[in-house]
Amino acid sequence: MFNLQIIPVSVFQQNCSVVWDNEKNAVIIDAGDDADKIIRFVEEQQLNVQKLLITHGHLDHIMAVDQLRKHFNVDVFGSHQNDQPLFEQLPNICQSYGLPASPAFLPDHWLNAGDKIQIGALTFHIRHLPGHSPGHIGFFDFENKIAFSGDVLFKDSIGRTDLYQGNFEQLIYTIKTQLFDLEDDFIIIPGHGSHTTVGREKQHNPFLK
């Protein structure tokens, strides 16, 4: 069985997702900040965190990752290596937003299109989703028809392309080839805001007409 709790974190209200199976094997996706809040939820639910996953290297998706890696003693997977400069420059990027400097770190494992992540009974397939950032990836659970797609597609909107190596044309191509090929009832968990479905965005998203 698939279990999901979204924990809004950071001043950016980023959707940190905690996912677990019936045996309480868990993964945390995009721990953007507020590590104590995430740890408290995990402990309350008595979850066994096995991996930390990252869709992309923007600060609001990674500021708590290194702290959680040390706390849970687990490996970090993702994003694609094209986002490496964002991890290396994290302290400076934090300060440019007027935030306390989070230490630079690198994931233990970069991920590529076609890779798979297994957490207990759950399997996530990796797709490369460039456009918002060059190394952006998504985690797709085809059995449960749910995708954790970071800041690529939102309800009625799309990701920014004015940040490091963002590209509007590439983002639109990514959405149409890597998300809109899914079934209409496939659920999209974005990096910010409420969830949506592929079918809804095909019909109503003004950026994708």
Where are these regions (language model features)?
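Active-site HxH/HxHxD metal-binding segment of metal-dependent hydrolases
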Residues: 34-117, 204-207
